[in-house]
Amino acid sequence: MPIELAMSLYLSSDEFLNPRASKYSRPLQPCLNQCKSSKLSFSSLKEQSEFNGVSRALMIPGRAKKHVSFADHKGLALTVVKIFSEFDDPIDIPDNIDNFFTSSLTVSEGKDKLTLDFDQPSADYLKFRQRIENDHVCLEHCMLKEKSIMGTVKVKNISFEKSVKLRITFNTWKNHTDVECQYVKDTYTGSNRDTFSFEASLPEQVPSHERIEFAICYEVNGDTLWDNNQGKNYRIIQSALRKSSNESNGGHQQYSQSDWDIHFDRYGSPRCSRGIFPHWPSYVGYEDIGPYY
């Protein structure tokens, strides 16, 4: 057995037990290298922050510190005042801008001179519905906008083919102008009423002795139906005339017999129960009241 003896003397015990083990065991190196110039301890950063009066847990090295300074610290004024003087030569304003401001002033002045000499028909909804059922046509709403009059008309849907016109005069019916009304699609379908809209231009100047009046014409099934404000026509007058009329009445509203019939209906009507007898609940005529739109 000379060979076995020689190998046991030559090999150490560790190499004999683990022949695949590395002969040299070196420690592993970290893969991230830290910059020596940027190594600042947390305690030093915290002390420096507390010294500067800033409560910061982390400071970025190399970043410039921000400073805030005001103008008065440097001997300057906090505000700057500029004074504009009048020009010796007039400013050259473009014609379109000059016309825009001039027309705006004219419109505002003319708008104040004209006013509606009637109440909105739809203000009394029950009477408004009754007029549509009886006369099949009624002015719903009207307003003055700049130098024009616009509004809406409600008609009873008797036939598909129909025509609605606005007949207006600016000189007390010496002559008149017809304006075709446009159909307006209702939001809610299934109603037996149709809505039409109109818009008519007003003259720049109206003589004080002349009146602006209009009426609504409804043509359907070969018949011509009119809404002329129950024979009085719808009038547009100067605001000064309406003010003088109110002052002559002593500031009190005049009521006719028809007006009293409107406000004093039979007991149980919606207006009477809400006005004179609010504690009387009643549903008389409630089934005849439909949606208002």
From Swiss-Prot:
Gene3D superfamilies: Carbohydrate binding type-21 domain (2.60.40.2440)
Alphabetized Pfam families for the sequence: CBM_21
GO biological process terms held by the UniProt record: glycogen metabolic process; regulation of glycogen biosynthetic process; regulation of glycogen catabolic process
Keyword Lipoprotein: no
Residues of the CBM21 domain: 129-237
Record carries keyword DNA-binding: no
GO cellular component: protein phosphatase type 1 complex
Swiss-Prot/TrEMBL keywords: Carbohydrate metabolism, Glycogen metabolism
Domain writeup: The N-terminal region is required for binding to PP1, the central region is required for binding to glycogen and the C-terminal region is required for binding to glycogen phosphorylase, glycogen synthase and phosphorylase kinase.
Record note on quaternary structure: Interacts with glycogen, PPP1CC catalytic subunit of PP1 and PYGL. Associates with glycogen particles. Forms complexes with debranching enzyme, glycogen phosphorylase, glycogen synthase and phosphorylase kinase which is necessary for its regulation of PP1 activity.
Function: Acts as a glycogen-targeting subunit for phosphatase PP1. Facilitates interaction of the PP1 with enzymes of the glycogen metabolism and regulates its activity. Suppresses the rate at which PP1 dephosphorylates (inactivates) glycogen phosphorylase and enhances the rate at which it activates glycogen synthase and therefore limits glycogen breakdown.
PANTHER family named in the record: PROTEIN PHOSPHATASE 1 REGULATORY SUBUNIT, PROTEIN PHOSPHATASE 1 REGULATORY SUBUNIT 3B
Protein name as annotated: Protein phosphatase 1 regulatory subunit 3B
Organism the protein comes from: Danio rerio (Zebrafish)
Lineage: Eukaryota, Metazoa, Chordata, Craniata, Vertebrata
